């Protein structure tokens, strides 16, 4: 069961402005990535369900976060149907992120008051997502649309909360473009969850980059 309601999760997204995301099939490695993000100040993490045994890894991460990382809100991404969403919510997912807009996922999440953020690529899709109860819309792939698309949407729909994923990097220039355009938060994957030259995760770098990105975002919000 979720530890946080959709309104609580939405508020943390608005307050912190950053949702790190990644997938790895190794539980211990994934714990270290999660800890690095947490130590860097992140209070949300989207574990993308993109590989075999993702549910097993996510369950272990959620238990670890509850026991060792107070205030860390675990969610799951790359969910493509209601059955998977229900399964992850039973394993403690506090939010569900999807690459597409699906009404069946909206229904199961709303029934449990769990935040869901569907991937949308047009104002029509965004409007439909909001009609279905979406608090924060995922703009995906963000790099295709860019800050100008967000700015255009916020003109007629000032109430819309947007989280671009894809095309976001932890640099001041990139984040400034997004937040000045009016995004609520950003999802950040490989540009933040860094690896060294040997292909292994660089946990110190992940922690430092998370901290720096959080500081940039807070400066832009204030």
Predicted regions mapped to residue ranges:
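Conserved N-terminal beta1-alpha1 strand-loop-helix module at the mouth
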Residues: 1-83, 87-91, 180, 200-222
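Glycine-enriched alpha-helix->loop->beta-strand junction motifs that scaffold or abut catalytic
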Residues: 38-43, 68, 89-96, 111-117, ...
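Glycine-rich phosphate-binding active-site loops on the catalytic face of alpha/beta enzymes
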Residues: 43, 95-105, 139-146, 182-202
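Catalytic cores of alpha/beta
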Residues: 81-91, 124-132, 169-186
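Hydrophobic faces of well-ordered beta-strands that scaffold small-molecule active sites
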Residues: 18-22, 45-47, 74-77, 96-97, ...
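Short, ordered loop/turn segments at secondary-structure junctions
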Residues: 49-50, 79, 100-102, 121-122, ...
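Histidine/lysine/aspartate-rich catalytic loop segments that bind and position anionic ligands
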Residues: 95, 99-145
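Generic hydrophobic/aromatic pocket-lining and core-packing "Φ" positions
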Residues: 34, 58, 85, 106, ...
